[in-house]
Amino acid sequence: MLGIGERMNLGMPNRYLFDTMEARLLLAGRIRVTKPDVLFCPLPLDAHPDHLAASALAEGARFYAKYTKLSLEGEPWYTPRLFYYSCSHLHAVPDYSFLVDISQHFEKKME
């Protein structure tokens, strides 16, 4: 659906996702290798601990991926755009900066 050529799992299982330095560096290395133009992460306004950790982890890894003096695989890279998506476990309605209408793709998503 997204046209992504590869899906990676960094070995961080459900309910055991934590924002640690080890996890940040692991993700930062993947960011350096893949050089994404955009990162997506959960909005850090959520009741689910994994979603909060994923948000902090993505922000931290994005920051560390640009450092020149870290011995990580790949060349330093700074992802220019970071977008947050809402999981709405709190049923909160944040003041979004923009919304994307996915209604024409919803049926395919449900497959």
Language-model features, listed with the residues they occupy:
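A conserved beta-strand->alpha-helix junction
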Residues: 2-15
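Metal-dependent de-N-acetylase/amidase catalytic core
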Residues: 12, 18-111
